[in-house]
Amino acid sequence: MATDSRTSWLLTVSLLCLLWPQEASAFPAMPLSSLFSNAVLRAQHLHQLAADTYKEFERAYIPEGQRYSIQNAQAAFCFSETIPAPTGKEEAQQRTDMELLRFSLLLIQSWLGPVQFLSRIFTNSLMFGTSDRVYEKLKDLEEGIQALMQELEDGSPRVGQILKQTYDKFDANMRSDDALLKNYGLLSCFKKDLHKAETYLRVMKCRRFVESSCAF
């Protein structure tokens, strides 16, 4: 793949990382509306980061003629497709806030291990030279969700057995077609799962605070 395509990829992801909200790791005592706003903002940013990373990886490594057939096979690859989580806004509206928070926590925690291997793939990236920053963003969102669960339950968040599930690590052998397809699938799942977490948080914020924007 041409060097300029990969350079565009690195710059896109690096810029998104720089735009991460300041003091992202801080979730001090604050009103419930602020806890929701902060969590939604972080989920939106992570989802955008995941979507743009997937798109640029696709441009750099996946031939256009193969993308459609590969994408059709990726749904079954995602661990999140095997759990009874809502698949969209309408289904999410039928669940309680605590159910949505637990599903959101599950989705975030399932990626905490795999993202630590991103640095083995994107060794020349300004942002992915180390995976620590992506990991920190996920940990920050995890803390925000746990803060919401504590606020709503008035106690420590409960984590069930389903939270033990996780994804495979990314494959560093970028010269292997199998590794490229595996990483492509993982990035697709990362994008889908972050979209779900963002949707759940926005549904909760919308129905709790009428002043919130519900057009999404």
From Swiss-Prot:
Keywords: Disulfide bond, Hormone, Metal-binding, Phosphoprotein, Secreted, Signal, Zinc
UniProt key word Oxidoreductase: no
Signal peptide: 1-26
Intrachain disulfide bonds: C78-C189, C206-C214
InterPro entries assigned to the protein according to its UniProt record, in alphabetical order: 4_helix_cytokine-like_core, Somatotropin, Somatotropin/Prolactin, Somatotropin_CS
Domain of life: Eukaryota
One Pfam short name: Hormone_1
GO biological process annotation, one example: female pregnancy
Keyword Ubl conjugation annotated: no
Family, per entry: Belongs to the somatotropin/prolactin family.
Role according to the record: Plays an important role in growth control. Its major role in stimulating body growth is to stimulate the liver and other tissues to secrete IGF1. It stimulates both the differentiation and proliferation of myoblasts. It also stimulates amino acid uptake and protein synthesis in muscle and other tissues.
Listed name of the protein: Somatotropin
Underlying gene: Gh1
